[in-house]
A protein has these predicted regions:
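FAD-dinucleotide binding site
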Residues: 1-253
């Protein structure tokens, strides 16, 4: 049984479609995997028969210093051993979801209470109270959200709750911005699409084109936290990112 508070499965994995083709998706959440470093993930992928492909790293990479000066480097990429899912990371979620009976996945079901002695769960589903019992309970939730959104019975030690609240969530402050193109002009210029910037607002950029090359894309990480992004505003942030990409890659961007 899977209880999911949202209206969809996948959590922080989100791969919206750009075209109608099944493989034409962009990863707005987690993107890469490393078979050499993740043997259990590799075994799972093989078991589920999911196709993966190597991150595009051919060509030069760019470095932008704090003053906006650009340097071109031809050394090996830090993503030389990185792979991506054909069809986006959501392909893994969909394959796992297919292992469940449809009735075993309860969407829009927010867990409110967990009794760790009786292994019973209270939840709210579309405004209605729900109750479940289990032999084992596995919680897939960032620790800060867990500490502030679920009531445990009996009450957990205050030291444990404090440690949860003091545990940062990996990549929680990051924001992605994706640029989509009909042609991969950077590849034609012997540029891998890889950029590292100390100026920003985008601090890292990578080639995010899908395996089927139905379109081409550059994905970026914005080096501003949520408060800074809110202060700047969406329109000005997008304008600054577009200007930076033109500065880095030329008017084709």
């Amino acid at each position: 049984l899977l209880l999911e508070a949202r209206e969809r499965t996948g959590g922080r994995i989100l791969s919206p479609s750009v075209t109608e083709h099944e493989d034409s998706k962009i990863d707005m959440g987690p993107t890469w995997l490393w078979p050499q470093l993740q043997p259990r993930m590799t075994q799972l992928i093989q078991k589920l028969e999911l196709p993966i492909f190597k991150q595009f790293t051919q060509g030069n990479m760019l470095y932008e210093n704090p003053q906006g000066q650009i340097q071109c480097h031809g050394g090996p990429s830090s993503h030389g051993q990185s792979y991506r899912f054909a069809g986006g990371s959501i392909a893994l979620i969909n394959a796992l979801k297919n292992q469940f009976n449809t009735s075993a996945i309860q969407l829009n079901t927010k867990v409110t209470d967990i009794n760790t002695e009786s292994l019973t769960i209270s939840a709210e589903q579309n405004g209605k109270a729900k109750h479940y019992s289990a032999d084992k309970i596995i919680i897939a939730l960032p620790l800060r959200l867990l500490a502030n959104n679920i009531n445990f019975i009996p009450e957990l030690p205050s030291e444990l709750i404090a440690s949860w609240n003091n545990t940062s969530t990996w990549m929680a402050s990051h924001c992605k911005l994706v640029f989509i193109y009909d042609t991969a002009f950077w590849r034609e210029q012997n540029f891998s699409g890889e950029v590292f910037s100390q100026r920003g607002p985008m601090t890292e950029i990578y080639d995010a084109s899908p395996h089927n090359q139905a379109f081409y894309a550059l994905t970026s990480f914005i080096g501003l936290n949520a408060h800074q992004r809110k202060q700047l505003g969406k329109k000005d942030l997008l304008r600054a990112c577009e200007a930076q990409l033109v500065h880095l890659c030329g008017t084709q961007a």
